[in-house]
């Protein structure tokens, strides 16, 4: 049985969270730390965009500033996510890990099995999305800059709606997959900080988003605590990966690397470069 490290790093800033994810990747690529599952949150609430998105065209920075939200460009792909009432997970594992498929899509399936099992432990009938023809067309030509408006292959849905949004990158022979499990959902806040051609288009796309996204609170009819979700996810990932998760801390080297990388994730050259 493989041993993984489990990190609970609490709430952090946008730059800190992305810097830590990358620092763990670097440390794992050097063989300094084992495969790692990290669970964390965001303070302040933050809009993150995917690596390939165009910040100036898709983000309303005046609205973002007025609400006091943070902003960061992720090293992974995907679309915009407002990180607020959620549990965020990140998985760092070698591409050569036993049983890890070479393709991005199939590795999503293997890693995300931990999400499915964890959510089922909470009593939710979670399963993988396999988009129909209409869904595939939406993926080929996304209707908005927002994540969660349609599920991709092997993303996690409950009652036909997307609950978890994930993205992945690979560097130095290492996979980083991270994503958001929605504790609650505020479409108004998300769509207020994105740009649209008109209010009419904004309202139409917001309705589409609401038809395809769901939160744990929506499903349970009551709040679900982050602590419960984190505990269930840790159990689910351990089962899915056939691994033993040992609670740990960031190493001194990871902390030093993360401190250095924060400058990157705070820099305009990174965040506004497209």
Swiss-Prot record:
GO terms for biological process: lipoate biosynthetic process; protein modification process. GO terms for molecular function: lipoyl(octanoyl) transferase activity. It is an enzyme of class 2 (transferase). Its EC number is 2.3.1.181. InterPro entries: aa-tRNA-synth_II/BPL/LPL, BPL_LPL_catalytic, LipM, Octanoyltrans_LipM/LipL. It catalyses: octanoyl-[ACP] + L-lysyl-[protein] = N(6)-octanoyl-L-lysyl-[protein] + holo-[ACP] + H(+). Signal peptide: none annotated. In the reaction, the free carboxyl group of octanoic acid is attached via an amide linkage to the epsilon-amino group of a specific lysine residue of lipoyl domains of lipoate-dependent enzymes. The reaction proceeds via an octanoyl-thioester enzyme intermediate. Monomer. HAMAP family: LipM. This is Octanoyltransferase LipM. The gene is lipM.
């Amino acid at each position: 049985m493989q041993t993984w490290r489990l990190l609970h790093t609490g709430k952090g800033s946008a730059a800190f969270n992305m810097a830590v994810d990358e620092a763990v990747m670097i440390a794992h690529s050097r063989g300094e730390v084992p495969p790692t599952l990290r669970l964390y949150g965001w303070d302040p609430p933050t809009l993150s965009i995917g690596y390939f998105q165009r910040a100036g065209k898709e983000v309303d920075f005046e609205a973002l500033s007025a609400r006091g939200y943070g902003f960061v460009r992720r090293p992974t792909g995907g679309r915009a996510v407002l990180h607020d009432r959620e549990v965020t997970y990140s998985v760092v594992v070698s591409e050569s890990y036993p049983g890890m498929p070479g393709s991005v899509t199939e590795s999503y399936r293997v890693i995300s099995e931990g999400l499915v099992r964890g959510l089922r432990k909470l009593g939710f009938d979670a399963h993988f999305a396999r988009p129909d023809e209409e869904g595939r067309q939406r993926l080929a030509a996304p209707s908005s800059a927002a994540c969660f408006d349609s599920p991709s292959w092997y993303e996690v849905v409950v009652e036909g709606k997307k609950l978890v949004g994930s993205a992945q990158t690979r560097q130095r022979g290492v996979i980083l997959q991270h994503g958001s499990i929605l504790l609650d959902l505020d479409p108004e806040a998300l769509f207020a900080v994105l740009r649209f051609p008109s209010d009419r288009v904004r309202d139409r796309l917001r309705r589409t988003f609401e038809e395809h996204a769901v939160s744990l609170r929506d499903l349970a009819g009551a709040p679900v605590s982050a602590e419960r979700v984190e505990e269930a996810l840790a159990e689910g990932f351990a089962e899915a990966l056939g691994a033993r998760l040992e609670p740990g801390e960031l190493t001194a080297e990871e902390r030093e690397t993360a401190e250095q990388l924060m400058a990157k994730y705070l820099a305009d050259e990174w965040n506004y470069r497209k």
